[in-house]
């Protein structure tokens, strides 16, 4: 249509500029045709626009009707679902409200992450709605623990009387723990007939906390027990308690026996469920710690490497407390892996000066380390000892010369005969490995000592080449020293051969 309008404008301009009558008639005819064509085109476009508008209106109306139908269906489904959820919540609240005042076994998560079940009293139902692990609606119950073992479990006396001035967060004691209703278990009553020697129990102390202990003796006539408490002072370790101040604990072995004898008992079922939950939690925690150890930085120095000189009681205690080798310290295994090194800073220097010294040493973090200083001092001391020993061995006086030259031959021969006789008579197979190691070290020292004596005799021969008599004695002494050295070397060879036969062999397939 734009092209037609442009052609019409061009034709009109040509009419204004043309004077020829024939051309003007042709242009007038062309202008008339273009005007008719434009009029027809406008009418056609108007009709098409009206039809398209009608189609869009119809589609819009259809879409609105479908949306209304979907909204009505969703509203109906939501109303039905809301009614079902409201009915479910109503039934749950009615069920839990009926349990208010009843005793149960409720979970408690300690500050270090461990989960344990304790007997508790249900004192209320919380208004908040939660979703449990099975993606189901649930409510929380407010419980007070009957046998609190830690301060955060101890009920507040003022709260029970309705006079506590602090809220639940600021109060040192418990205003009731909130636990999911689906996690509570059956109440475990105390089994007093189980009170016997070495029976583990919880005993109520004057601080209202229940401490672990073991029964020493039980008097069922007077309903009293003498209990040895764990972790108490020596004077207060053994105490007498009434039966109502004790709660017998069930060990894993006894729990397994009772579950075999009466598997249908609700008491045993609840204890089995508690133990299975605890086993699952411990297994999950251990697997998480092992997985964490695989991604932990492996230092060059092993944690506890100093215990190679001891019996390793520290590592054994840490392993008993649950430490896994390769992980960091702490209950989550995210603590330090390498031990903290002691640092000794220069006396009378500021921290800035110490930092400058460390930067001058290329930022060495162990520049002030105590271990490095001790190792450096040990190396200096070893070098000084070696130099002092070398000076002592090289220094000779008149008495040492006379002892070595005049009396050394007979004594050395006598010692050599004794060493050879001992090497022949000893049955090496009857000695232990430790004895063989000690004997190997002693023989090696004797060989080194004998080699030094031979070197001294050779020096004396070179120094006294003109004295014939002294030369004879020195040759005899040198021959004797060489025989003793050969005997010691043969004995060392037999020792090494015996030690080699006792080593574990590795077979290659």
Curated annotation (Swiss-Prot):
Pfam family, one: G-patch
Gene3D superfamilies attached to this UniProt entry: 2.30.30.1190
InterPro entries hit by this protein: G_patch_dom, Znf_CCCH
Zn-finger region bounds: C3H1-type: 155-178
GO molecular function: DNA-binding transcription repressor activity, RNA polymerase II-specific; RNA polymerase II cis-regulatory region sequence-specific DNA binding; zinc ion binding
Superkingdom in the source lineage: Eukaryota
One GO location term (cellular component): nucleus
Basic and acidic residues bias locations: 411-420
Keywords: DNA-binding, Metal-binding, Nucleus, Repressor, Transcription, Transcription regulation, Zinc, Zinc-finger
Main location: nucleus
Compartments, record wording: Nucleus
Disordered: annotated span: 253-277, 409-430
G-patch domain residues: 310-356
Function: Transcription repressor.
The protein's name in its UniProt record: Zinc finger CCCH-type with G patch domain-containing protein
Organism of derivation: Drosophila persimilis
